[in-house]
Amino acid sequence: MSNEKIRQDVLTYMESHATHPVSYDDLGRDLRYKGKGLGALWTEIELMIKDGLLVKTRFNTLGLPRAMGLVTGRLQVTQKGYGFVVPLEKTEEGDLFIPAMHLSGAMNEDLVIARVSDHGYGGRREGKVIRILERAHERFVGTFTRSGDFGFVTPDNRHIGQDIYVRRKDFLNARNGDKVVVKITVWPNGRQKAEGTITEILGKKGDVGIDIISIIKDKDCLLY
């Protein structure tokens, strides 16, 4: 049985039981999967959770995101710091507004799950990121600035919206104004800023051709 067939069976079943979360036992029994098919079912369910098509609750039950007041999608962060979750499944409600204080450490283009608030400002639908399913980037191109025994990289992509802290041992001999590639070692979480290590020095800001090199490198840093 194909993975696509299993996935469709699960989604059809969940749609018909959307009013409440479903246990693994009920799902396996009602779909009548057995033997290797049952193992394939559990494997596909874990992939669906990872993809944000299903949500696993703390009670070890499964539900559809929209039936639980959740939205799964790619986060688009604006240069002003707030963002929008663009749903994987298009709906009449459209994108979900996320205030900067409710990004919860998520960064531009990450795949996230957000909880929809009951009341948004001015009647606008808004929410809060509650889970980061997939990071879109782990490396960023930016400009290095040193400040004593630490430094930081300001990403060229202004939609990232935050500097990345770098400890002295991770400078890779970078100097003020260097264009660098920095790899995240500690992800932001809403309370703590991102930390990283410099993996490559591209050249000095303003060098001939450095802008083109930086753009190419930045595209190479995309994970998905």
Residue spans for each PLM region:
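Charge-lined substrate channels and their catalytic hotspots, especially those that engage the 3′ end
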Residues: 1-223
